[in-house]
Regions:
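Short glycine-enriched nucleophile-adjacent loop
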Residues: 168-179
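Accessory cap/linker subdomain of secreted extracellular hydrolases
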Residues: 112, 176-178, 184-306
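C-terminal, loop-rich substrate-recognition/catalytic regions characterized by aromatic stacking residues
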Residues: 235-270, 357, 362-649
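Alpha/beta-hydrolase fold nucleophile elbow
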Residues: 154-165
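Active-site-adjacent alpha-helix of alpha/beta-hydrolase-fold enzymes
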Residues: 323-345
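N-terminal cap/lid segment of alpha/beta-hydrolase-fold proteins
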Residues: 41-78, 501, 505-507
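Short beta-strand/loop motif that positions the catalytic acidic residue
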Residues: 313-315
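Cap/lid segment of the alpha/beta-hydrolase catalytic domain
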Residues: 77-150, 199-200, 206, 358-370, ...
Length: 649
């Protein structure tokens, strides 16, 4: 995702930018907690400053004549010859990349091991020429940059790429461009750079299930602006070095936005105006529907893009893009351009937030409110061995390790798999059932592996002016909606939330992989949203969210054209799959929540059947979920076969 920035102008990297520069690497060794994260960062920065030589304001020419600005860090006291290079291609400040976030730990390791590190700004950002438009040109610019590096007299002709969030998203098209010098890639939390892949088509996470993700109003206000002060064309490097001593091109005084009230603005295409935001792509994006042909101009990584470089994906269960990220791993495993690339697609999935890996883990890693146990992991070690193998030819066994290493929440252990989804799973349907009143956790909603014999239904009212509040989840960089796993028990007291729960489990149930969702809906309106949330309920009643999904019902038949509902008619609605890895322990219960809103994580459907983005007068929806023999509303859980699926009856 495009990481956010601190609205207070500073000359250090904003906190949320540091989040986006943090997720990197993995081996099963858990590092000792002798130093805090802040201490390790300080030590890494000190090492970089002492042991590297910096070449700033390098002007890298693109094929269209635009020059991109780059800083190169060389290992000190070593000959500048036959050097492998790691490229970080970013829209953020170079100094923030070096001094903040886990990138400092990676850069230190690269310098220690004899690598050059090149940090280059994408076009239109800071001292790079051109106009910033998200991901437009990333494939060509990435190819040209790798070509430039490979031709330098100090290069060994091999380039690795690494990044989290924006600097990972840029790698999709770069990898698909298949420059022969692009030897290995490490994209982390890169879903905002993904278009159509597998069951997902989120236009780079702008949408989920056709609903706008609220985080983008925050990100485009603080980081995604299109214009900035610029300089005369064709300044020399020496002139740019002099200029850069006086300006760093970062806004000094950015007014703090009142997001708490702004997110309630209707129509939503007035939110950026009301915030007083600088012009950005958001001014255009917010006025598009998912089937707008203009989305095709953005260079999302998608089906048809076949990676040329071996790729190590690093993701997290509470990343806003976890579904597309996992789907991209699966796609490239089957479709990468060469046998070498296909056989060397690896993935690590942590239990943390977007780009948080390596920053928050302790013996008791808390994500939101849930203790995930000891989730520490040597990310730097794995990435270093990955690049040593592919850029230096080291025979270190890194490619002989399991293809997937994913953290199982609940059990709080790292697990390894040869494939994803794992082979030893059974797809087990869990059916929604009730006595006609599943409203709130006090209702009679049931979740059962037995298909209901009796037709029943549950009705609720969705009022867009009183939506269900978002609480945690797969979200990033959005102050009004922190991400992670939170106790949902309070929200489950609302009558506009349908709650379906299993009996208490007598034995553990391990759920690993994609979770299919099919609901049968009738409504009095032409269009509405359906939301679903998977929850782990402990013996103490705390109900921790695992993943959630949404679908704007007009898109239930695909993204080509909307199909509206007729009042009272029952429709099958397949929500894009959820994905998780969680062990439901004996004594716990599996729960599903169904509603029509999760705000401000997703924009509110005004239920009119109109564009939604330019409307301000909502219609109240009376939505009915049907279940029974003719309408088997259900979720399908991927359950590990070696663990019993029995529940108390």
């Amino acid at each position: 995702m495009r990481a956010s920035r601190n609205p207070r102008g500073t000359r250090t990297a904003p906190a949320t930018v540091l989040l986006a520069l943090a997720a990197l690497s993995a081996t099963p060794v858990r590092p000792a907690a002798a130093q805090t994260y802040a201490q390790k960062t300080t030590a890494a920065v000190d090492y970089i400053l002492v042991h590297s030589e910096r070449e700033s304001m390098m002007q890298v020419p693109m094929c269209d004549g635009v020059r991109l600005s780059a800083t190169i860090l060389f290992p000190k006291d070593r000959p500048r010859q036959n050097i492998p290079t790691v490229l970080i291609f970013i829209p953020y400040l170079t100094e923030g990349t070096i001094r903040g976030g886990l990138f400092s730990g990676f850069i230190r390791s690269f310098i220690e091991n004899g690598y050059a590190v090149m940090i280059e700004n994408v076009r239109g950002r800071y001292f790079s020429e051109g106009t910033y438009t998200y991901l437009v040109g990333s494939g060509n610019d990435g190819y040209d940059t790798i070509d430039w590096i490979a031709k330098q007299p100090w290069s060994n002709g091999k380039v690795g790429t690494i990044g989290c969030s924006s600097s990972a998203e840029e790698q999709h098209k770069m990898n698909a461009a298949r420059h022969p010098a692009h030897a290995a890639a490490v994209p982390m939390g890169s879903g905002a750079g993904i278009g159509k892949v597998g069951p997902y088509n989120e236009m780079g996470n702008f949408y989920r299930g056709g609903a706008v993700q609220g985080v983008w109003f925050s990100w485009y206000y603080g980081a995604g602006y299109k214009y900035h002060p610029t300089w005369p064309a064709n300044l020399t490097r020496e002139q740019m070095l002099r200029v850069s001593k006086f300006w760093n091109m970062e806004p000094e005084l950015m007014p703090r936005p009142n997001l708490d009230s702004a997110v309630w603005t209707l129509p939503i295409n007035k939110i950026m105006h009301n915030l007083g935001a600088m012009p950005s792509d958001m001014d255009d994006f917010v006025n598009r529907l998912p089937n707008d042909p203009k989305w095709k101009a953005i260079e999302f990584g998608a089906e048809g893009d076949r990676s040329g470089a071996p790729t190590l994906y690093i993701n997290s269960w509470y990343d806003l893009s976890i579904g597309p990220n996992v789907a991209m791993f699966d796609y490239q495993t089957k479709n990468a351009a060469t046998e070498t690339a296909r056989n060397n697609i690896f993935m690590v999935v942590a239990p943390t937030l977007h780009c948080n890996q390596g920053q928050v883990e302790t013996e008791h890693t808390v994500v939101g409110e849930r203790d995930m146990g000891d989730a520490r992991y040597d990310y730097v070690g794995l990435v270093q061995r990955w690049f040593d193998h592919w850029l230096k030819g080291a025979d270190n066994g890194v490619t002989k390790e399991p293809k997937v290493r994913a953290y199982m929440m609940g059990e709080n252990q790292w697990k390894t798999y040869d494939t994803w989804p794992p082979k030893n799973i059974d797809l087990v349907p869990y059916y929604l059932d009730s006595d006609g009143s599943a409203n709130s956790a006090l209702g009679n909603g049931r979740l059962t592996t037995t298909k209901p014999a009796k037709a029943t239904s549950d009705a609720f009212v969705y009022d867009p002016m009183h939506p269900v509040p978002s609480l945690g989840g797969q979200i990033c960089c959005f102050a009004v909606n922190p991400g992670g796993s939170f106790d949902q028990a309070g929200l489950e007291m609302r009558n506009d939330v349908l709650v379906y729960t299993t009996p208490t489990l007598t034995e553990r149930v391990d759920v690993v992989g994609n979770i299919e969702v099919s609901l049968y809906l009738a409504s009095n309106v032409k269009d509405t949203d359906l939301t679903i949330k998977l929850v782990d309920v402990g013996p103490d009643g705390k109900a921790f969210n695992l993943d959630e999904g949404i679908l704007r019902v007009r898109w239930r038949e695909g993204w080509e054209k909307p199909v509206f509902m007729e009042s009272g008619k029952v429709y099958k609605v397949d929500i894009p799959p959820l994905v998780t890895s969680n062990s439901f322990a004996a004594g716990h219960r599996i729960r599903v929540e169904v509603s029509s809103s999760s705000f401000p994580h997703f924009d509110r459907n005004l239920n009119t059947g109109g564009n939604n983005y330019d409307e301000k007068d909502p219609v109240i929806a009376r939505n009915v979920i049907h279940h029974g023999p003719a309408y088997p509303s259900r979720i399908v859980l991927p359950i590990v076969r070696s663990v019993s699926t029995k529940t108390a009856q």
